[in-house]
Amino acid sequence: MAAGMVTVAAPAEAASTPSGACGSGYYLIDQHALGSVADIYLFYNGSSNCAVTWVRSPNGTRTYDLRVQIERKSDLVVAPDGGFYKYYAGPVKIGAANTCISWGGSAEGIRWASGWTHCG
């Protein structure tokens, strides 16, 4: 993926772990709780960040209002995803070498955003 690329992936099959949603080569660099409903996970693979808002205890039938996004500071490009999902929002990916990102999201109205961080 080129450094300027932004993607929102919709896997054919639901991933079984947050890291699995991003794909191979990504490792966890940060996470934040959204109350008791979900967590936002941030992954990195050496050139791109990936974020997922992951429901903690899905029952397989209920849908949750979930949002996730990453913003790149160098040009303010945003990679967002949101809607009503059973398991997770995202993954959203953005190339972010040599710049900072802001990442965050929401679950059932509980919102959080990081501010500029993970600069590199």
Explain the meaning of each model-derived region:
Residues 1-14:
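Secretory targeting and sorting signals
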Residues 14-120:
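Post-signal peptide N-terminal regions of Sec-secreted extracellular proteins
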